[in-house]
Amino acid sequence: MAAQRFAEQLGEQIANEFAASQQYIANAVYYDGLTLPRLAAFFYQQAVEERNHAMMMVQYLLDADAEPVIPGVAAPQTSFSDIAAPVELALTQERRVSDQIAALMGVAREENDYLSEQFVQWFLKEQVEEVASMSSLLAVVRRLQATPDFVEDYLAREDRAASADPTAPPAAGGAL
């Protein structure tokens, strides 16, 4: 059984993950509209990843006999000043999520909820990767902003295709 306070905070994080997923869809659609398919694909994949993070949290609450609440989310930002702006927004979002996940870890520790603390550890590791990936992409986009096709080439070379992480928590509904 998850500590009540942890379950409540995790419920808030579910909302944050769904909001991140929606924002990444908006980023992808922006890039699709500019005919930048690799940037679009990158963010469509990020959207799926964030949605799956939310579903992992839902599954944890189900497994911990806590009632998950599926929240509504605010509309994402859909217009941007230039091709770097969506990546800048994504990096800011990933840094904020890192702080939120760290706070979840703090709540689990304060509540002596060792099972929840163990669950959150995977997300901490994931956030290090997310911030690093978005930081690198932002550096490339800023450097190549005048030649977005070179950003597309960079993404093609990097080919960060998602591979299944055997240490990832299970997601509610499976990895849909």
Q: Could you tell me what each predicted segment is?
A:
Residues 1-176:
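Iron-associated oxidoreductase/ferritin-like identity signal
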